[in-house]
Regions:
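Pepsin/retropepsin-fold aspartyl endopeptidases
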Residues: 1-121
């Protein structure tokens, strides 16, 4: 298994932007912005939420929202406000909002097969 990184741009509510190299993490629910990035684009916490680390350790982090732009598209997404030393992560909520899925074999992002459901006659 390899790691997949993707370059993106994040924008805060006042229009400030920052470039970010995201680690695509299909095990992370929300995307995460390092402290230096979310402070640069002037994000503020909307709520505090509990998360579990990969080893099962519970932590609490602030959550906000920002505009995320990738080569495949852009959207508004919730983001965890990381602390010093945290790495930028692109989580599955952002991927799903953008209609993207990570192919685990090629380690590339591809358009998601979008199913609307059945149609009634």
């Amino acid at each position: 298994m390899g790691l997949t990184f993707i370059e993106g741009t994040v924008k805060g509510p006042a229009g400030k932007e920052a470039s970010v190299e995201f680690l695509v993490d299909s095990g992370a629910v929300y995307s995460l912005l390092p402290e230096s990035v979310w402070k640069e684009i002037e994000l503020t916490a909307k709520r505090r939420q509990r998360f579990l680390m990969a080893d099962g350790t519970p932590i609490e982090r602030d959550v906000s929202e920002c505009h995320i732009e990738l080569p495949q598209g852009d959207a508004h997404s919730p983001v965890i406000l990381g602390q010093a030393g945290d790495e930028a992560l692109l989580g599955v909520v952002t991927l799903e909002i953008l209609g993207l899925v990570l192919n685990p074999f090629t380690r590339k992002l591809h358009p998601m097969r979008m199913i609307l459901g059945s149609q009634r006659s």
